[in-house]
A protein has these predicted regions:
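Conserved beta-strand signature within the Rossmann-like core of class I S-adenosyl-L-methionine
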Residues: 173-182
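Helix-to-beta-strand junctions that scaffold the AdoMet/dcAdoMet cofactor pocket
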Residues: 158-159, 172-173
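Residues lining the SAM
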Residues: 152-155, 179
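Short glycine-rich, flexible loops that bind phosphorylated cofactors or substrates
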Residues: 157-158, 184-185
Length: 228
């Protein structure tokens, strides 16, 4: 499984095997991921391919500059727990899981098939990951439920962006991390161009005053300290 992130791919295949009743030896389904041999990982990969599971999400690839930047921020603040909003294909979430193996992570997404993929990863051995089908704008989870909230390439898609920001600030105990495109593009799903001034207003309206902005390759990144 050299071209794959083996722990993530193996977890997904094992979780999907349970859902789909694929034939696998019991020990391959229950053995801790870190104890699987190369031969056992190869069996899992072959099973996943035979079942036509979508394994391309788990191929090793170079991190996007914006993802590297956010991971660097998170290494600086060392989150105790994380809520990732709109995880989609795991462009950020998967590297985070690999680089922060001690952090409890909750992912919320509107798309059922995205949530199901992440639930398979959790069921397959990465049980510190919880995936929920949920709308961040209307989620009534208790205040301060998560140390840090990430909204990465998400806010530009949300019609009521102020409501999403309000909820993120309410749910975070310490930080909210945001990335958005900094230039107009032709993506019809991008319904806002969120400039530094606009984001500042949104977070100030939510009661957050301590904001730090940075940028990388066409993206604006915000670290909002909600505890001060």
């Amino acid at each position: 499984m050299e071209q794959y992130e083996s722990s993530l791919a193996a977890a997904y295949i094992r979780g999907a095997a349970k859902r789909l009743s694929l034939s696998l030896p019991e020990d391959l389904l229950t053995k801790p991921l870190e104890n699987l041999t190369d031969a056992e990982l190869a069996v899992l990969l072959e099973t996943g391919r035979d079942a036509e599971l979508k394994l391309y999400h788990f191929k090793k690839k170079e991190l996007l500059p914006r993802v590297k930047a956010v991971l660097g921020i998170l290494k600086g603040i060392q989150p105790e727990s994380l809520l990732d909003v709109g995880s989609e294909r795991g462009v950020f979430l998967f590297p985070f899981l690999l680089e922060f193996p001690w952090v409890e992570v909750t992912s919320v997404d509107l798309l059922p098939h995205r949530v199901e993929m992440l639930q398979c990863i959790s069921a397959g051995g990465i049980d510190r990951l919880t995936a929920i089908e949920q709308n961040i704008c209307t989620w009534d989870r208790e205040d301060g439920a998560f140390d840090t909230v990430t909204l990465l390439e998400v806010l530009e898609h949300i019609p009521n962006v102020q409501e999403a920001v309000n909820t993120a600030v309410r749910l975070a105990r310490r930080y909210v991390v945001v990335s958005v495109p900094s230039q107009p593009d032709d993506n019809p799903e991008h319904i806002h161009l969120l400039t530094k001034n606009i984001l500042t207003g949104l977070f100030q309206n939510a009661g957050c005053r301590k904001l730090h902005f940075s940028g990388v390759n066409g993206h604006l990144i915000l670290l909002a300290n909600v505890s001060e």
